[in-house]
């Protein structure tokens, strides 16, 4: 009986792995950045042919030996809604109600994390929040020692029923821009209360910071490498213990999405060590711009 069960589970796992898969950030109601190439990627069986269809464009790609595949579609002007279809050998994925507009990354600590439910006159704001062309993606708050590529999050369309969980700063920004431009607005809320700027900065960029500004992290090492971390007996670490921990989990997975710019609301937790903040902010902004390959407005 156990042998039969094992064979069944093995065959089932092969069928699951053979299906084409998209990251969850490609979900119903998403907003893609206008006037920039659109990157679509996912997983499939090794060497599997994948057909991607979107807004009158179609691309055929083959997954590599690891099952990874990706393609880029031509830029589009603002508009929609569109439907994304991804066809593999075993299954087809359909993502609906996609808009093309401006996508803003909204990041920082508690002031950015503060939700509409907690603002002054919240009930009035929620009652009037009928903005179907404003959508948000709330990035889960977590940290990782090394950069990861995916997050478990889906887009949410703004409505009186949903807006309460939107970042207040991000929502009021999106509302103002949308009312002025009449362009769909996507807001990616990647924020975490109590964080310092260092944890939002990649490890590579942190290495460019003056050594005198890194003394607060470890006595023996200015930066803790993944190898040294895994060698520790006690692997417990808080989000502010070392540079890059939050960047790895909450910024790096977003690099596949083109964005218009960044709203940054952070600094309170660096007030006790304000002198090097200018260096860290300059470093982080430069690093994010380099990774998105554009001079993002902050």
Regions found by a protein language model. Give the residues of each.
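Cell-envelope and extracellular/periplasmic
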Residues: 19-298
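Positively charged n-region of N-terminal signal peptides that target proteins for export
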Residues: 1-4
């Amino acid at each position: 009986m156990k042998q039969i069960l094992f064979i069944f589970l093995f065959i089932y796992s092969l069928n699951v792995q053979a299906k084409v898969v998209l990251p969850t950030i490609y979900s119903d109601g998403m907003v893609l950045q206008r006037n920039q190439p659109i990157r679509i990627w996912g997983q499939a069986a090794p060497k599997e042919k994948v057909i991607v269809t979107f807004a009158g464009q179609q691309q055929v790609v083959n997954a590599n030996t690891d099952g990874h595949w990706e393609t880029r579609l031509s830029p589009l002007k603002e508009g929609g809604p569109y439907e994304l279809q991804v066809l593999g050998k075993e299954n087809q994925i359909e993502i609906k109600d996609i808009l093309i507009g401006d996508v803003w990354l909204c990041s920082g600590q508690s002031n950015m994390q503060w939700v509409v439910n907690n603002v002054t006159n919240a009930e009035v704001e929620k009652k009037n929040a009928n903005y179907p062309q404003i959508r948000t993606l709330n990035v889960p708050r977590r940290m990782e020692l090394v950069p990861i590529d995916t997050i478990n999050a889906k887009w949410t369309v703004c409505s009186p029923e949903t807006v309460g969980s939107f970042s207040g700063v991000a929502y009021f920004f999106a509302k103002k821009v949308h009312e002025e431009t009449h362009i769909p607005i996507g807001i990616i809320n990647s924020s975490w209360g109590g964080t310092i700027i260092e944890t939002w900065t990649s490890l590579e960029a942190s290495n460019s910071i003056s050594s005198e500004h890194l003394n607060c992290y470890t006595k023996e090492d200015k930066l803790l490498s993944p190898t040294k971390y895994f060698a520790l007996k006690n692997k417990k670490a808080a989000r502010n213990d070392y540079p890059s921990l939050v960047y790895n989990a909450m910024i790096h997975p977003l690099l596949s999405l083109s964005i218009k710019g960044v709203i940054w609301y952070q600094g309170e937790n660096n007030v006790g060590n304000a002198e090097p903040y200018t260096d860290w902010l300059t470093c982080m902004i430069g690093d994010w711009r380099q990774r998105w390959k554009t001079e993002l407005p902050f």
